[in-house]
């Protein structure tokens, strides 16, 4: 519980929130993945929250240059990231299509 400000907030918050843990895990996953180009930028970041939720962006480059192989490798990495969401007590929201 937060107090009247007499103590440093950083010392009061002992537990990391699940979204922070997921972002850190995902960043480490990308950094250590053998298909990800470690010489280029990679990041996991939150975008601006909307009424539909809080978007999380995965930004990374692969070593692979051939398009079909690149698409398959990218999909495998993203599928693993999506599958891990529930392990952190989070969920993916998809806005339904209206006719």
Predicted regions and their residues:
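Structured, soluble regulatory/oligomerization domains located on the cytosolic or IMS-facing side
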Residues: 1-99
